[in-house]
Amino acid sequence: MMSQDAGEPFFAGKNKWGYDYMSPYMLIKDLGKVKTLAIGRYKARFGMGLVMNNSFSMGKQASLASIGRVSRGLYAHASRQEGNYMQGIGATVETIHNLDVTGFLSYRKIDATINSDDNSISTILKTGYHRSATEMLRRRNASQAIMGGNVYYHVNGFHFGITGYQTSFDKPLHPDTTKLYKLIAPWGKRFWNIGADYAYMSRRISINGEVATGNSKGIATINSINYMVNSNLTLVAIQRFYSYKYYSLMASSFSEGRSVQNESGVYLGAKWQPIYQLTFSHYFDWAYFPWPKYLATATTRTFDMQHSATWSKNTWSITARYRLKTWNKDSKDDNDNKFLDRITQHRIRLTITKDNKLLFLRTQGDISLYHKDENSFGYMVMQQVGIRKNKMQAYTSLAYFNTDDYNSRVYTYERSTLYNLSFPALYGEGIRFAATIRADFSSNLMAIAKVGGTHRIDNNKIGSGLQAIDTKTPIDVDLQLRWKF
């Protein structure tokens, strides 16, 4: 995997090998007792992610179906994401029947902003941008080492696991504690975390949980149950408590605040199919943040709910979805005094899809309404077409969007290269287009090419600051070649 962001030097400066980012790896599976061997750049996920997960985390909609059934172990890092991966070697071995042991070692350079007074790390950067002289100075100017492992026992639908790791930096982490929300950020040079996870799965029920701690002495725990009442009704409940004192630099799990820290919450979901052609999905999520967050100088709360209905017959389906979300954010009164304001966001989506072996068609409409002091409104209409024949697949999409500002932005999903999710955020007025072609030459050789672009009607410039592009229609290109042997 090779990646180049707009504005980054190509075969110039520090990029003497051309691309700013490359991700070499080798992944071997099922080699005798060795279930997985990862060399180069790889990812790891164990338990429910409270200790170690630099792979992905479930969204709230996906939790209705996937809770308790997420994958675990070591994976190749084959995405364009430049911040979340390990570099070195990792292996999973079946030592005895039903007992797997995983060990991993990693050392890599990281991007960081450095405090000039004591040469410590103020912030670890994960954007991967190296476009200006300042950003180049922050490129790989610190290092991180990780050593850890996992023990996993499984039998008759039950499993129990223990995960632990230690990480260290060549420079200590000293975040800017003059900012209230950073008072609970990790501080120091060496950190460790350990956790235990459990699960029981049967045909109708899955129960999962994990509890973790670390050198901060804070506690994090998450517990879930997915119960299939009958063939037509499934219920999901997730409880989470992440102390504001807890942190793990390698964690990622189910959360509202995008962090396994400073959050308590309850999620309730249901999936109901009263008749064969009709399915209803619902979830409600309440979250509480005891410590001030970014852009919120006091305790805050969030409420999020979504309702959707899908009607399907043969190769046709129609889905209607409504989502309501409210949360707190700092505002200022006429005297410049801060207070917590309440923000409300509504999102509506309607899709009509035809999907068979040869043809894929989808028409989609989106509406977004954001309210703080005043309303911000946006909408989008989109058409996708896909053709699948023999070993070739081709997909195109065309969308027109019009929003008042970034707050009422809309999202569209585009098929892209493997391991790379593409959900561009669209705002202002314009047209988004994309085309993707995939060719499977054999069971071992596959190639994907994607071209996408956004034509802005309301502006001659895309983005702002260092990300500003003086064109109405920037183009992005993705190429991927995979050879398995």
Where do the protein language model's features map onto the residues?
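Aromatic- and glycine-enriched pocket-lining scaffold segments that form the walls
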Residues: 83-132, 140-142, 146-150
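Outer membrane beta-barrel
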Residues: 17-111, 229-248, 392-406
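Outer-membrane beta-barrel proteins
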Residues: 3-21, 75-82, 137-140, 212-214, ...
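Acidic/polar N-terminal loop/beta-strand segments that form early-domain functional surfaces
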Residues: 3-5, 40-42, 452
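A subset of solvent-exposed loop/turn segments in beta-rich extracellular surface proteins, enriched
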Residues: 16-17, 48, 52-80, 109-138, ...
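A conserved hydrophobic secondary-structure block that centers on an alpha-helix together
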Residues: 7-9, 19, 26-29, 124-128
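A short acidic (Asp/Glu
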Residues: 10-12, 49-52, 219-222, 374
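Exposed, low-structure sequence patches enriched in small/polar residues
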Residues: 21-25, 84, 140-177, 183-485
